[in-house]
Regions:
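Hydrophobic residues at beta-strand termini and immediately following loops
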Residues: 41, 144, 176
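Glycine-rich phosphate/pyrophosphate-binding loop and the adjoining helix
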Residues: 152-206
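N-terminal beta1-alpha1-beta2 submodule of the flavodoxin-like/Rossmannoid cofactor-binding fold
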Residues: 1-99, 104-112, 197-206
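Short histidine/acidic/glycine/proline-rich micro-motifs that form metal-
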Residues: 11-13, 148-152, 182
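Helix-loop-strand module that forms the ligand-binding subsite of alpha/beta enzymes
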Residues: 74-159
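Cofactor-binding loop segments of dinucleotide-utilizing enzymes, especially the Rossmann-like FAD-
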Residues: 9, 146, 178
Length: 206
């Protein structure tokens, strides 16, 4: 039995191509893996702590030797919430990420969430020589990204998500691109339908 974290970086909309493909993937995944535990994290519905001045100052104080209990109440609340997001990622065996491509990059909320999983001392560490090494292993990720244009995985969003996941130790990253719908509007429905079929095929193997 695996624990699957599903990170949704797209507001709900019946027109969302991202969500259509994600739903097809998850429907099939649940059929194939009925005993797995699915935990959904909708970044547009939940409050998760972004890095801000209080987080930076809390990290500085802890690094200087202060205890968590010595931090201000605001620092404690924010850091605890930030750490909860990190721990949620660490507890997952598989991670599914779904997002649209916005200005060649992932949505800002997804970037903020990724900051919570890219944490020195928890998901990676620096060696004595200054080299960064991952602290996670054995995880798998599946990335769904929808885009109106055609980028063939050369966009910054694709490379960023894969790069960070690899950096923290997630070496198995499968990408499903749903793209070209705006560039070829007459083919848009078929592109999405084909992606749904492909998502189900890949769900069987994930």
């Amino acid at each position: 039995m695996a624990k699957v974290l599903v990170v949704i970086a797209r507001p709900e909309s019946p027109k969302s191509r991202t969500l259509k493909v994600l739903n097809a993937f998850m429907d099939e995944y649940v059929k194939v893996h009925p005993n797995d535990v699915i935990e959904k994290l909708d970044l547009y519905k939940v409050d998760f702590q972004e890095i801000d001045g209080d987080i930076f100052s809390a990290w500085d104080e802890l690094e200087a030797g202060r205890q968590f209990s010595d931090l201000t109440s605001i620092q404690q609340v924010k850091l605890a919430q930030f750490n909860t997001s990190t721990d949620q990622f660490l507890a997952a065996d598989k991670v599914v990420i779904a997002n649209p491509l916005i200005n060649l990059m992932v949505p800002t909320k997804l970037k903020a969430w990724i900051d919570t999983i890219n944490v020195a001392g928890k998901t990676f560490k620096y060696t004595d020589t200054g080299t960064a090494v991952p602290l996670t292993s054995g995880k798998k990720a599946f990335h769904i990204q929808a885009a109106g244009g055609k980028y063939n995985n050369q966009d910054f969003g694709t490379q960023y998500v894969k790069g960070i996941l690899n950096f923290v130790g997630v070496q198995s990253v499968t990408k499903l691109s749903v793209e070209g719908m705006d560039h070829f509007p007459d083919q848009a429905e078929q592109i999405v339908a084909d992606a749904e079929i492909e998502s189900r095929r890949l769900a069987d193997k994930f």
